Amino acid sequence: GQEKWRTQMGDINIGESMTMAPLVVKDRVLVGVSGGEFGVRGFVTANDVNTGKQVWRMYSTGPEEEVGFPGSVETWKGDEWKRGGGTTWGWYSYDPELDLFYYGTGNPGSWNPDQRPGDNKYSMTIFARNPDTGKAVWAYQKTPHDAWDYDGINENVLVDLNINGAMRKVLVNFDRNGFSYVLDRKTGELLQANPFVFVNWAKGVDLKTGRPIEDPEKRTSATKNTKDICPSAMGGKNQQPVSYSPRTGYFYVPTNNLCMDYEGVEVKYQQGQPYVGAIVVSKPGPGGNRGEFIAWDPTTGKKVWGIKEGLSAWGGALATAGDVVFYGTMEGWLKAVNAKTGDVLWKFKTPSGIIGNPMTYKGPDGKQYVAVLSGIGGWSGIGVAADMSLEDPTAGLGAIGAFKDLANFSNQGGVLTVFALP
């Protein structure tokens, strides 16, 4: 139980922090960096698992030798790439057969797109890297020149799927920009891109170029307040993870039905200070419900069934071999549903909103247990968890506009609730 080594991963004085779990691959400890709203330049670091010493570090933006992949610097104005965001605070996946690990990079800085013309590579990108060297084998940018804060760090799920009659080793990503992506995880070839929530900032994705087909009326700027952009910066899906069932072949996805008004503002970079540069108001999307829990068929790119929720589905999903799927709601309900039909089989009200992930395990007594941690907070719960005005819809980077009434449904307080199966 004694500490074996300790190493500093970043500099808090310039806004760098660490909010992710590391991934150990062979003798490497892979760790990213947070701080995209502070002008932090994203990077991923490999440390020696035995000594803690840095083996390599690769950045999201900048010269090829620092990114491990060509084509970044020329997509930025001047030296904006030095504070270009692309932080790496999400989830990492590893394929031992291909010996590649995968992760997403976040939004560029600042949120005002007028200050950083160009594609802003490699923010908003899925990287495939070699864990020994850090060199990137491929990179796919989902949202070039992000003008909506569609922070691209969501998890990448590695599965083998039948795509167009052939089995492919793929990576599946449900991005905050509202599109579900299926890529060949060996080559980075884009195989599918389909909206899994209501999307109007783009009309689709060109599979040949990989670029979104944008609606120019929904592009944001510091010269106007762009109205009713869907999804909002809070994402078609935020950081709550999906679950995949090889029994049904479906992904189970907790989603948001939120849109926003967005206006960029001029902001100057100051080391260690917020570097946002936008006024945002999130609000309920079409139909008024703010969330939906869906089953998604990745081979067809279509929703199979959905359960609409009054508030966003901000907790993760758990699919089991018994064809039962669990998920939580911001009101505090833990629900069990039929994986094939979406019928609600059972639900239990926990003391606070659920933004964590249900889990299951086998105890020493041989019984199977299901557990969930409730306790509202985070971005969606900031109106309850923090002291801020509920009369200002721009507060909490726009979260108050979407969840002003959250206190009517959920209180603070963290509780771990555990259920034993018969």
Predicted regions mapped to residue ranges:
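Repeat-blade elements of multi-bladed beta-propeller folds
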Residues: 17-38, 80-111, 115, 125, ...
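C-terminal structured "cap/appendage" subdomains that terminate the fold
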Residues: 177, 320-413, 417-422
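C-terminal substrate/ligand-recognition segments
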Residues: 235-263, 273-348, 352-361
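Short, conserved, GDST-rich strand-edge loop motifs in beta-rich repeat architectures
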Residues: 31-42, 103-120, 257-286, 375-408
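Short loop/turn segments that connect beta-strands within beta-propeller blades
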Residues: 48-51, 113, 131-133, 185-187, ...
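Aromatic (tryptophan-biased) beta-strands that constitute blades/sheets of beta-rich domains
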Residues: 2-9, 53-62, 67-82, 135-141, ...
